[in-house]
């Protein structure tokens, strides 16, 4: 999709950009694949904030997405490409030959009317899902499983892709979007192609109100808080941090401090760590 720029008719419009939604073919989602979505505002089951800067925003309905891609051997045809307010990628409605309808993540270059398939014998073409062991080296993939049958967990955001680098026994070597190279069980499924809507990251929100429509609340710097609220708070005027390294609101070091567990069970599957 192309990016649309506005003329600076006001301070809020100056610099604002939006996607033109030229790929979207309908604004009416499939009702049978909708579920209610209650807002959590970043709170857990105790009512405590566990994720800051969340709350408000436009009311949404959840679109039930097929991350497992387990409908083997039955061809499906792309009926629509739709906007999904719950993720950065677009979604595609698939009408299967047996009458079932499912949503999938819309890969780049997937068009209405194209046919897709799942299963070990599916062709290597955009939108088809098959086990990693059946995908040729060099192929770009997305929606990758970490355990067979669990459903895709990796590489689901707009514009992302991973590459199959090689095969070693029952494992397949994958380079992820972060630069990390890791081994994943060959029985795990992935979808061929890159995730669509790749220009999503280039959109400039433009004004605070638009962020609030998206459910994003303001981010307040620790240095302008009181000492009771943040380790950076207090002092007269623009005071320095007063510590040897920046801290989180809970007093833990941040900005470069490693938070990954020293003895993580998945370390044995990582060949090369992500780029810094």
Swiss-Prot record:
Gene3D superfamilies: 2.30.30.30, Nucleic acid-binding proteins, Ribosomal protein L2, domain 3. Keywords: Ribonucleoprotein, Ribosomal protein, RNA-binding, rRNA-binding. GO terms for molecular function: rRNA binding; structural constituent of ribosome; transferase activity. Disulfide bonds: none annotated. HAMAP family: Ribosomal_uL2_B (MF_01320_B). Belongs to the universal ribosomal protein uL2 family. This is Large ribosomal subunit protein uL2. It comes from Geobacillus thermodenitrificans (strain NG80-2).
């Amino acid at each position: 999709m192309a990016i649309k720029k506005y003329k600076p008719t006001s301070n809020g419009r100056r610099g604002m950009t939006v996607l033109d939604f030229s790929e979207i073919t309908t604004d009416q989602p499939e009702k049978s694949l909708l579920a209610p979505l209650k807002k959590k505002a970043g709170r857990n089951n105790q009512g405590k904030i566990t994720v800051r800067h969340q709350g408000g925003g436009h009311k949404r309905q959840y679109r039930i997405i097929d991350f497992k891609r387990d409908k083997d051997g039955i061809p499906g045809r792309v009926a629509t490409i739709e906007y999904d307010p719950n993720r950065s990628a677009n979604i595609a409605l698939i009408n299967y030959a047996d009458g079932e309808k499912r949503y999938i993540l819309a890969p780049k270059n997937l068009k209405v009317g194209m046919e897709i398939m799942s299963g070990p014998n599916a062709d290597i073409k955009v939108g088809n899902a098959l086990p990693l062991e059946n995908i040729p080296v060099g192929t770009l993939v997305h929606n990758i499983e970490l355990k067979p049958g669990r459903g895709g967990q990796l590489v689901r955001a707009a514009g992302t892709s991973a590459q199959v680098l090689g095969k070693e026994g029952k494992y397949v070597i994958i380079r992820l979007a972060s630069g990390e190279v890791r081994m994943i069980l060959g029985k795990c499924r992935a979808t061929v192609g890159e995730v669509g809507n790749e220009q999503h990251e280039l959109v400039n929100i433009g004004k605070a109100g638009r962020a609030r429509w998206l459910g994003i609340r303001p981010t307040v710097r620790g240095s302008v808080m009181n000492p009771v609220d943040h380790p950076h708070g207090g002092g007269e005027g623009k005071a320095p941090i007063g510590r040897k390294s920046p801290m989180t609101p809970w007093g833990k070091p941040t900005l470069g401090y490693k938070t990954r567990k020293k003895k993580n069970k998945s370390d044995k599957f990582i060949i090369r760590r992500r780029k810094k």
